Amino acid sequence: MDSELDRPTWQLPPGVTRGTWDYVHSGSIATQYDSFHAGHPLLEYDRRLVLEQAAKIKTQGLGRIPVALDLGCGTGRVMLPLGQLGWRVLGLDLSQSMLVAVGAKSTREDRERIGRVRANLAQLGCLQDRSIDLAYCLYSSIGMVQGTENRRGMLRQVHRSLQDGGVFVVHVHNRGTWWQDPGGIRRGVGDWIRSLRDKSWEYGDRVYAYRGLPSMYLHIFTEGELRRDLQESGFAVDRWIRLDRTSSGELGFGWCLPYFRAGGYLAVARKSQ
């Protein structure tokens, strides 16, 4: 593991920055994940949303056990409850420590329903065509993939893996909240100028210190950006949720200046027939 952690930057997988590589190789990030995020309203809200979608799919009478795909499964906060509802769930994560944490929390019955695969979200060619009924990528995990083409490539692979009419739930943080943060205007303008000068830097990219890691990477979206990415990848959006600033629920009067007011976005999209 240490030798893998020390891999030169030019040898990192597609869409993976040095900061993300350090993140997925940090054992403490995984072992402390549940306690660190305990009580976060978004993590309860998005889980309910996925389980609601799962319940709707089961009422369609598939005549078989439904299959879900958890993209960036972490410690299994959604995949384990889903498995306990009778679904078969495949959890993907680049962090081996996260996958180990899922196994440690799983009962024997859980392990009969769930699978764990170490995988890079920007390299999903392993997925079978039309094999998934419900896919989800939560807590802005898609934002950890660097580069528009890598993110769209991921979405296209998810689209390919879904059954016709299959559902995809995705969350991103909203870039517009930057302007309200201390120093946000200066940073926003500086990042925009950098995106014009540096081909490896996209407007919306952010690198910051996080839990002992010096260069955590995350791409922050606008509403239009995620809508375009989904549309370009073949998805039709059934439901668009603008979250309030704390991401605890839908934004009140969401039509009013959502770019500046929304904490993030959740999209429920569908693979067109």
Q: How would you label these PLM feature ranges?
A:
Residues C126-A135:
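A short acidic, Gly/Pro-enriched loop at the edge of an enzyme's catalytic core
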Residues D2-G72, A262:
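Conserved class I S-adenosyl-L-methionine
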Residues R152-D164:
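A short glycine-rich, Lys/Arg-flanked "PGG" loop and its adjoining helix->strand segment in the class I
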Residues L134-E149:
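A short SAM/SAH-binding and catalytic strip from SAM-dependent methyltransferases
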Residues R77-Q123:
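Class I SAM-dependent methyltransferase SAM/SAH-binding core
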Residues V169-D229, R239-S247:
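SAM-dependent methyltransferase
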Residues G254-Q273:
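Core SAM-dependent methyltransferase catalytic element
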